[in-house]
Every structure is written in C-alpha cells, then in structure tokens.
Amino acid sequence: EPCGLTQMISMRYGAVPVVRATGGLRDTIFDVDTEKDRAAWEVDGSTDWKVTGDATNGFSFEGTDAGGLEYALDRALDSYYNDRAWFRKFQERIMRQDWSWNRPALDYIELYYSAIRG
C-alpha cells in the first residue's frame, strides 16, 4: 500500500516504520538520518521551527532494490541493539506525533476565512 493509515496507526502504538519512500509514505515518514529539515517543515508546518530532529519518525530508502531495504533495516536494527535508550526515546517521540485532522482542518478554516476577507 503506497499510503493509507497503517504507518500512522502503527506509530501511535510504538512501531518504528521502515518504508520505501514513495507516495504517501514519503509524505508521512521522515528519515531520522536525512530528513530533519523536511520533517520540521511538514510536521510542525513552520520554517522557523528549531530543527532538533524531533520530527523525524522512521527509516526510509529510495528505489526498489534489495540493497536499499537492507540499508534501512540495518540502520533500524543497529539503533535498536546498539543504543536502546535512544531507540526508546525515538519510539516515545513518534508516538506523540499528531496525525489527526485537527491541524489540517484549522489550516483549511484559516484559508477559507482569508479568502472571504481578501
């Protein structure tokens, strides 16, 4: 499934996603090593957010080859086995991410009001 709710539901329960960066998965999973800036923009919605890496939420890879998948899995497993404290904090952080419709709904309401006033 290129997107859907699976990854967002699983994160809520502590699963750390390892995904191929395609479709909606690319829109919702931000690689812990390479996508801090994009995660800060997409999750927090603001470029003035202090980029600390707190918005990253998984491990991703490009392409469809076995090497890409292996690389992403190796990074995930390495962090689990070699830095368990970091991994647990990472799980807690992604469990707190809000993927509800609250923020998008408010964004749309603000857009509609600005169009009416404009």
Language model regions located:
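Catalytic binding pocket for nucleotide-activated donors in carbohydrate/polymer assembly enzymes
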Residues: 1-89, 95-96
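C-terminal alpha-helical cap of glycosyltransferases
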Residues: 102-118
